[in-house]
Amino acid sequence: MTLLVDASATAGRPFPPYSIPVPNPVLSGSLAAWQVRHTMLHIEANLETALQVTELAAIAQLSVSHFSRAFRISFGQPPHSYVMAQRIEKAKRLILSDERITLAEVALSCGLSDQAHLCRMFRKLVGVTPAAWRRTYRLPIAAHESPVLPDATVPS
């Protein structure tokens, strides 16, 4: 999230270099930078396991309730939602990385219980099934096959 200086407040004056988009200042009650970094690294490294909020709170050296509140302020969503979003992002990378990988293998690699759970969560967060997403975004297999592009017109 970025902040922009109100143009009316600087009418007739050039924008100082520091007033171009700047990072959002630290929000009151949010996680410290080191807590965000350690939490994100732990989540990314352990997506295939069952991650618990108690485990994440211990990494941030906070109580579960304080961690959950600070996490929501820092990330804009609860820890469980963030972890699920990261699992689906990992699933997207795996789906595109190898055409032969099954959705069951993808699910297990992302810490989901089975293919049905992957499909449910994928559809909920992305809006389409993993198979439909794969067909849309996969790379062309053969030289004669053109990539699928959204809103592309067919050349005549």
Predicted regions: what is each one?
Residues M1-S28, L139-S156:
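N-terminal intrinsically disordered/low-complexity leader segments
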Residues T10-V26, A50-Q86, A107-A132:
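Basic/polar phosphate-binding segments, predominantly the helix-turn-helix DNA-binding elements
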Residues R37, L41-A45, T49-T54, S74-S113, ...:
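Terminal helix-turn-helix DNA-binding modules in bacterial transcription factors
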